[in-house]
């Protein structure tokens, strides 16, 4: 009932935090071993990587300020349910999940420039890929080709200076 009624309802209403929480609760009760194993791996990784992620973000923050962008940067760790679903759907191991950590760059479009909102996404992409190596097969362009649900963003996966893959999602506040 939760999986087929309440989770889709929360998603449709835009209650993404509640949706994620219900998915994790569902996983904890339906697949307790998988839930505990994934949660333990997340906890080990997050404690070790939090400083590295902040160190990854700092130069991006500075470069975007220097380029004149108005923005905020948020970070997130993928939820246990999302990890479990990806592992099962793609038949991959935990270590093959490249978007365990994600950084969202949400910018305010500059109306005083000739660059369109889309161009500004690519400008940010150009700045950050000039700083970090990116995984070319992990670039997702949902700015030029929005998802069926209307989602727009530019995703790429970058290698930090310490060797961890971090997904970066670039979008305007409107997107």
What feature does the model see in each segment?
Residues 1-175:
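Nucleic-acid processing machinery
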């Amino acid at each position: 009932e939760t999986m087929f009624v309440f989770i889709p309802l929360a998603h449709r209403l835009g209650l993404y935090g509640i949706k994620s929480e219900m998915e994790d609760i569902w996983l904890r009760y339906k697949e307790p071993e998988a839930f505990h194993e994934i949660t333990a791996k997340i906890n080990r990784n997050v404690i070790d990587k939090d400083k590295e992620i902040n160190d990854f973000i700092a130069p991006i923050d500075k470069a975007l300020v220097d380029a004149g962008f108005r923005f905020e940067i948020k970070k997130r760790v993928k939820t246990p349910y999302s990890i479990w679903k990806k592992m099962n759907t793609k038949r991959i191991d935990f270590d093959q999940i490249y978007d365990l950590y994600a950084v969202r760059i949400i910018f305010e479009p500059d109306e005083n420039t000739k660059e369109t909102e889309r161009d500004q996404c690519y400008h940010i992409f150009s700045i950050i890929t000039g700083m970090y190596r990116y995984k070319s097969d992990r670039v997702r362009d949902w700015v030029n080709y929005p998802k069926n649900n209307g989602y727009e963003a530019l995703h790429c996966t970058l290698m930090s200076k310490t060797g961890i893959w971090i997904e970066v999602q670039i979008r305007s506040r409107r997107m």
